[in-house]
Amino acid sequence: EMTSSLVGSEMCIRDSRKTGALLVISMIPTALLGLTGKRLALLAADSQIVPGIGFLLTGVFLLVTDLNKSGGKKGPREASYDSAMWIGICQGIAVFPGISRMGFTLCAALLCGYNRKFAVRFSVFMSLPAIIGAFFTEIGNFGASEMTAGLGFTYVFAMIIAGFAGCLVIRNTIAMTQNIKLRYFASVSYTHLRAHETRRH
């Protein structure tokens, strides 16, 4: 019994290390796309057409993944670093308006053969380094004269609060998305698309 417990603990540690390595690999394309596409994404945000296209693509991706019954049996040990790169690319694309980061990364993970539980967890935890990286990127945009002690404290305090709030909702998010069909999330994207089209006209 003690031997099996030790083996289980060792496997858990290995899974955690592999997951961490996969997350680091996924951040490479995310960071590159985020930095190079930031200006284009800001221009796209002012467009009346691009956000609608983003909602449409998100809905189609979710629906196709759901109808195709995508997903496999891969956990951290079976997941490849190539798949992490592809999922990271999908997260980088989500810098554009209308593209759901959670939707794109979850679908990509399922299409790469990840099991549903690991796909959801990986998608959720991928957001944390991306958010932190975006925070420090925005901080770097301020000049020394613009960055006061008060403003710096506000940013740090906001990040801490967001971190606590994120930790509280992560568990519920994982539990909810593990069981719900992706087509329901697709319908939400189409609802946003209709609302966007209504505002345009």
Model-derived regions, located:
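Interfacial loop-to-transmembrane junctions
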Residues: 167-190
